[in-house]
Regions:
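Conserved catalytic core of the tyrosine transesterase superfamily
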Residues: 1-354
Length: 354
């Protein structure tokens, strides 16, 4: 049966907006003004994350600085009383805090994101002349330690794809579903490893997104922009095999747009399902690396940089707006290079070499 509905991204945005509207009822009235002010330059997901961060910040103010005031009672005048010391105490508080009935903890990266949200709000109202001071600018951003790229080696990539194809190492429970899902799972993992696609982009693909005549497909990038990505024959073969399986399955619903990847319930596969799928196979191949879809993207980015040596191509294909983001992750000396130079410096040289 045909289904006339908004596409995946429109549906996702509507869900985000509904969630934002619901959460705004817990926040001070002026938060709605802030979100409206940044609407044209932010995605719905960014604004939803702003709301999550602000809930924690105002809960902190209500508990620690403005005792006796509920979150809804906090005013812009109260923001004028927030000092840089208060913000620093907030960042320290995030190391071990209670929110609702949960005990939570933020690492430095999460603290930096929450500080960025609070800064954005204060800057917005300060620039509008609605508050007199913006002390958030005086607070140093938590220092972030560079994380080494976690990726699969070439041999591990081959083993991973073999594991998907043959099901070796799977639990008895997972093995029971393997015959039904292995063609789909092979297509998903091959697409990750062969194109560097983001998980949100993969989940949002429709049948019509794929153009086999040009070995290409259209993705919706962060911010809603569209981009054309290209794939190899190996990726194309995996996609074609999955589409053929779907074509011959009478349970596949007739709907428009038709989601490319389906769950066992014949609905568009979810981000969580893809994360679990990757985890299921990757822990067999490389249990210590904790491979995620994003790390499969890193695997592709590393391989592409090795092959081309061109950081700009890698940035373009991965959809990085700032090439410095790419350079930071992929232009470092690779593990193989480190190994190859390990014996270049000799501590004991024959006398005649000096």
């Amino acid at each position: 049966m045909k289904k006339n509905s908004a596409d995946y991204y429109q549906e996702r945005n509507l869900k985000n907006l509904d969630r934002i509207d619901s959460l705004l009822e817990e926040l001070p009235f002026f938060c709605e003004d802030f979100l409206r002010g940044v609407e044209t330059r932010t995605s719905t997901l960014t604004r939803l994350n702003y709301v999550y961060d602000l809930r924690i910040f105002f809960d902190f103010l209500s508990r620690r600085k403005l005792r006796g005031k509920s979150i809804r009672e906090i005013t812009l005048d109260d923001l004028n009383e927030v000092t840089d010391t208060d913000i620093e105490i907030f960042l320290s508080y995030l190391s071990n805090y209670r929110f609702g009935d949960k005990r939570l903890s933020c690492d430095e990266r999460a603290k930096a994101r929450k500080l960025s949200t609070v800064r954005s709000m204060f800057k917005y109202f300060f620039n509008k002349g609605l508050i007199d001071v913006n002390n958030t600018a005086k607070v140093a951003t938590p220092k972030l330690h560079e994380k080494e790229i976690v990726r699969l080696e070439n041999s591990e990539v081959s083993t991973l794809l073999d594991t998907v194809e043959y099901g070796s190492g799977l639990s008895d429970h997972a093995s029971g579903y393997h015959d039904k899902t292995k063609i789909r799972d092979t297509a998903i993992l091959t697409l990750f490893l062969g194109t560097g696609i983001r998980i949100s982009e993969l989940v949002g693909l429709n049948n019509e997104s794929i153009d086999f005549s040009n070995n290409s497909f259209i993705v919706t990038r962060k911010g809603g922009n569209h981009a054309i990505l290209y794939f190899s024959d190996e990726v194309g073969d995996a996609l074609a095999a999955y589409l053929e399986q779907k074509k011959n399955d009478p349970k596949v619903p007739d709907e428009e747009p038709a989601p490319l990847f389906l769950s066992m319930q014949y609905r568009r596969i979810t981000v969580r399902a893809v994360e679990n799928l990757v985890k299921k196979y990757a822990k067999i191949v490389s249990p210590l690396k904790k491979i995620t879809p994003h790390k499969l993207r890193s695997t592709y980015g590393t391989a592409l940089y090795r092959e081309t040596g061109d950081i700009y191509i890698v940035a373009d294909v991965l959809g990085h707006k700032d090439v410095n983001t790419t350079r930071k992750h992929y232009a470092a000396i690779t593990e193989d290079n480190r190994r190859s130079v390990a014996d270049k410096v000799r501590l004991h040289r024959p006398i005649d070499e000096d």
